[in-house]
Amino acid sequence: RGSXLTIHPLRNIRDFFYVG
């Protein structure tokens, strides 16, 4: 994915680490 900053804090951490 590669959201970066998402609405969900927990999801944000995962998206931030798995930026793709």
From Swiss-Prot:
Coiled coil: none annotated. Its EC number is 3.4.23.-. It comes from the Eukaryota. Keywords: Aspartyl protease, Glycoprotein, Hydrolase, Protease, Secreted. Its main location: secreted. GO terms for biological process: proteolysis. Expressed in chorionic epithelium (trophectoderm). One of its GO terms (cellular component) is extracellular region. This is Pregnancy-associated glycoprotein 75. It comes from Bubalus bubalis.
